[in-house]
Regions:
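Conserved HGGG/HGGXW glycine-rich cap/lid loop of the alpha/beta-hydrolase fold
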Residues: 6-70, 84
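Active-site loop/oxyanion-hole signature of alpha/beta-hydrolase fold enzymes
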Residues: 57-100, 274
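Conserved hydrolase catalytic core segment
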Residues: 91-135
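Conserved alpha/beta-hydrolase catalytic His-Asp/Glu region
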Residues: 155-204, 208
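Short beta-strand/loop motif that positions the catalytic acidic residue
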Residues: 222, 228-230
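Catalytic active-site module of serine/aspartate enzymes centered on a nucleophile-bearing elbow/loop
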Residues: 252-285
Length: 285
């Protein structure tokens, strides 16, 4: 059973979150950027062992639109995460971020390391660090040269959209690249995406954001145990790009999920949930 709850964040904006599952809490922040949290589902069945607290970022899903559009920015979303932790009454928490919210969670970790027990970054954007996410992209694409859709999808991945309608067309053409297998589950997830995005939240996420040159050093000193999950076939970030992050985060462990893309819990739910649960349940080193 899933319930929706609400709280007032640091600036008074009412934010919504979903609670589902059983077990210790795992706070989950969605990516997009600007995408409602519904796309995370139950993270491949992770709700069987964890109580998932799934945040709808401001202006998305069931959360309210903020009065100030500048608060859509990635570092302000990190402030929302801290407000949610305080609202939940958690002294420390386990935190999971996917895609764009990987950046949110890295900023949060740098600002509030004492509030984290464990951190899970799934296919995180590296933009807040000023690092490339498309390292060896040509090699990743070449590995999928046998797919019937590869030429059209690869062209759409880097094409410039003429307007909003064209953007959606290109998004759907490129969608197979985001999954390990372009099957019914992948198609259903991709088809649901357009309705889940809030344009203002997407546009505002990186607006006027400049990476802090001190952030890599602060994260390198982070002692919080961190799991990095990369999809073997992901194009953004590639598994090669994720090795940069693993080298930076000295307390991290990188796992590359075989046959997975940008949404590893869709490609192989059992493998994803088992990997994350094993990490969260492990005894402290």
């Amino acid at each position: 059973m899933t319930r929706v709850a609400r709280f007032r964040s640091w600036d008074g904006t009412e934010l919504a979150y979903r609670v589902t599952g059983d077990g210790p809490p795992l706070v989950c922040v969605p990516g997009g950027p600007g995408q409602a949290v519904a796309y995370l589902g139950d993270l491949g069945g992770l709700s069987a062992t964890r109580t998932l607290v799934l945040l709808d970022n401001r202006g998305t899903g069931d959360s309210a639109i903020p009065a100030d559009p500048a608060t859509y920015r990635v570092d302000r979303i990190a402030d929302d995460v801290e407000a949610l932790r305080a609202h939940l009454g958690l002294d420390t928490m386990d935190l999971l971020g996917h895609s764009a919210s990987g950046g949110t969670c890295m900023l949060y970790a740098a600002a509030h390391p004492a509030r984290l027990r464990r951190l899970v970054l799934v296919a995180p954007s590296l933009r807040v660090l000023g690092l490339q996410s498309d390292v060896d992209l040509a090699h990743v694409l070449a590995e999928r040269s046998h797919e019937p859709w590869i030429d059209e999808a690869a062209a759409a991945l880097t094409a410039e959209a003429a307007d909003e309608q064209d953007l959606e067309r290109l998004r759907m053409l490129a969608a197979p690249l985001l999954y390990g297998t372009w099957n019914d589950a992948a198609r259903a997830q991709a088809a649901a995406e357009p309705a889940q995005f809030a344009r203002a939240a997407t546009d505002g996420f990186y607006a006027d954001f400049t990476p802090d040159p001190a952030l890599p050093e602060r994260l390198a000193a982070l002692a919080v145990p961190t799991l990095l999950v990369a999809g073997e076939h992901d194009v953004w970030p590639t598994r090669h790009a994720m090795r940069q992050l693993a080298a930076l985060l000295t307390a991290s462990r990188l796992t590359v999920q075989p046959g997975a893309g940008h949404f590893p819990w869709v490609d192989d739910p059992r493998a994803f949930a088992a990997s994350v649960e094993a990490f969260l349940a492990a005894a402290p080193a």
